C-alpha cells in the first residue's frame, strides 16, 4: 500500500514515534518489546515506553536530553518530513508511525515500514535518536538494525 501525505511545514514542538512489531513474527520469537513509543518534547524532555505482546507496558523511562541534541533531532525530522515522498507499507511487517506537532498546534502523521532508511544529510535518524536519548535498543525507524 502506498500513500502520499502532506509535507511538514513549520516548527516542531513535539515528536511522537511508535515502532510496532505486533503484526510481525519477530516480536513473538524474541523476549523483546512488541511496541515502543518515544515522545520528545520541545523542552528536551523524553518519555519512553516499551510494551509486550500482551499490550502491557513492560518498561518506561523519563529523561531529559541536552538542548543541542533535541534541536538537531527536530531539525533532522523537519528536514526529512518536509520533503514530498511516497510512503509504502507492508501490513505483515513492523511499522513505524510518527506524529509531529508544530508550534501552531497542527498535527502531521506519517508511517512506514520498520527497516526503512530514514536519513537526513546522510545521518540515520534512528541512530542519532538512539544515541541522543541513550536507549540502545530503541527501534525508531530501522528496528535497531
Residue ranges and their predicted role:
Residues 1-30, 55-63, 68-145:
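Short, well-ordered, aromatic-rich surface patches in folded extracellular/luminal domains
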Residues 43-53:
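N-terminal glycine/threonine-rich, aromatic-flanked beta-hairpin/loop signature
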Residues 39-45, 101-105:
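Short acidic-glycine loop/turn motifs at beta-strand connectors
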Residues 35-39, 97:
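Short, surface-exposed charged micro-motifs
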